């Protein structure tokens, strides 16, 4: 069956939380803060693929969520960044927001557009260390990723 319209929910990945950690070694009784930062979440991208000619892939599956960023670790270890989620659409697709405004007109092969922005990773307690605050006992949580409903419409060009 030919599908020329789809409404899907996309959510970018949340940022990972920063770590609250202190250096501990045998002969270092009071090591300073060493909490690492959280990783960034993954973005949601739409990419034009010449192999597709309908929006059939989005007929039954409507929710697409990118992976979250990883938590920071001790010893200033940075959390893993979430991978971007790439959704393939046929050429001639028009992307519209919830209010009906056109976000993108995808025509050229391999053209990409970001439809949901990822959340930033939180900072660990090592990032808050200063001359006056030498042992910060707090860390940031990661920011949430953007989420939205979008409509995909396929412009059909008749060959005569």
Regions found by a protein language model. Name each.
Residues 1-160:
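Conserved P-loop NTPase architecture
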């Amino acid at each position: 069956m030919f599908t020329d319209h789809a409404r899907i929910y996309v959510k970018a990945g949340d940022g990972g939380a920063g770590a609250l950690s202190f250096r501990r070694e045998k002969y270092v009784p009071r090591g300073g803060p060493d909490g690492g930062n959280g990783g960034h979440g993954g973005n949601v991208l739409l990419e034009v693929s010449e192999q597709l000619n309908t929006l059939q892939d989005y007929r039954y599956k409507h929710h697409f969520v990118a992976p979250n960023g990883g938590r920071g670790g001790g010893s200033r270890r940075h959390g893993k960044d979430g991978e971007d989620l790439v959704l393939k659409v046929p050429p001639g697709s028009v992307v519209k927001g919830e209010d009906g405004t056109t976000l993108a007109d995808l025509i050229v092969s391999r053209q990409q557009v970001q439809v949901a922005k990822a959340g930033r990773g939180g900072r660990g307690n090592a990032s808050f260390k200063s001359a006056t605050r030498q042992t910060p006992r707090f860390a940031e949580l990661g920011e949430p990723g953007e989420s939205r409903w979008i409509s995909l419409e396929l412009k059909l060009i008749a060959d005569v």
